[in-house]
Amino acid sequence: MPALQPLSLSPADWWNHAVLYQIYPRSFADSNGDGIGDIPGIISKLPHIADLGVDALWLSPFYTSPQKDAGYDVADYCNVDPIFGSLSDAEKLIETAHEYGLRIIVDVVPNHSSDQHPWFQKALAAKPGSRERARYMFREGKGVAGDLPPNNWESVFGGPAWTRVAESDGSPGQWYLHLFDASQPDFDWKNPEVWELFRSVLTFWLDRGVDGFRVDVAHGVIKAEGLPDGEKLHHPPLGNNGPFWDQEGVHAVYQEWRKILESYGPDKMLCAEAWVMPLAKMAHYVRSDEMHQAFNFGYLATSFEAEALRSIINESLAAFGGVGSPSTWVLSNHDVVRHATRLGTDFVSQGQPTGIGPRSPEKPDALLGLRKARAASALMLALPGSAYLYQGEGLGLPEVIDIPDDRRKEPTFFRAHGERYGRDGCRVPIPWEAGAPAYGFNTTGESWLPQPQAFAELARDNQVGDPDSTLELYRSLLRFRNQQGLGKGSLVWLDGFSSDVVAFANGSVSVVSNTGEQPTARPDGEVLVTTTALGDEMIPAHTTVWIKTA
């Protein structure tokens, strides 16, 4: 295990080139054996994360919640749900992570709360037109008796985005908006009280030492004036140009938040989850007076094909560079099919939350998917800018496809009546020890989602010290990325390769990624990293190589 290296206060712009590791708390490590990961479990694994070589952690929500959407339905933004631990546990996590030189980013969910949030409970008990209802998007229905929704908006999880409430006398009443599950009512960001609520949330966690926030559904908090009908879509995506996404008013919210963070010093940061295309529009979220990072979902959604990769990299560098920001690269997270599976088939939706399951018409090629995923990760980590890793990808974990219907938890699966599988498959608890109960997730064998037998082979303890393992590949990639300053570097395209090859120089490192089916010539120089064994002077298919040229 690495020695403790207390967090340095510099550089202030650390996020420009950092590699951040996403932890989905309920699936990371379970200290009390109840089948759900928790904060003490995370603390116990901090030495392993530090040993991997990342710079910071992003934690998905651990706040008080009914867990209808795995914590993204928040009932109290300033407390910890008992299933994850206590507020003192969270404070200990922040302190201990800093002792290991790891910064901590936490989620903030500003678009909606839980329907169990005290504000919403008060709104249900109040009358139409009241101060309490004005904090949310309550509206009168259409039709003679108001029995039709106020507009035709659809939930991202399936079904209508409106639910009707019963008034205090039992009569059918107003409708409230929920772009996600009915248990997640949307705030009305035209209300100053909502602004004040989130000022207090940010300062609460900044006072406890967090280093920044990942902002959930950052592009959704402002809705179009008058709530007009949108285009009717069977599966409304998170990033379409509907009247509830990417409205101009969102930027004022984050301009204020930026000022709040800057009052705590120059090294606090905001990262946007904004499913906005083209990237030139996404880049608006990282202008100098707004956020510091925005996940590059255009890159995530790109196939492992040279022409497509060159195009999205060029577009990314131009779009984000145009506002003075590096790109924030990402391939997997808790909302999308893991890229070790996604790259093994042309069928799987790149976006969320469609998912893949046992009744999906095409089954991915697991070996091909892992081979491509290793190559894709090596390509991503060689690019200038910052990058995010999702727990388990450094073990080569695939999407878990064969989860029985009666074990699923995903709201999408139930709202879509099983037509869409959603995100359970990427959220299965990760394996630490091949021969332990629940593969080391805990000591009891309990697991809130079932783990496949294949996880034994992929467990961390099976990969430590194996030079061919995905874990050791990631450790090498992160070590050389840091040593060679690739995150702080710049990209120069290299000529002389076939159309199936992505090749560029970043400083003194040449990066060659063969996305095709045929071997390609390897440049001269010292091989720092290869994602597939090199037997001769050629680079095999679906392989990325880093070569030191000077």
Model-derived features: positions:
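Active-site and adjacent substrate-binding regions of carbohydrate-active enzymes
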Residues: 1-526, 530-550
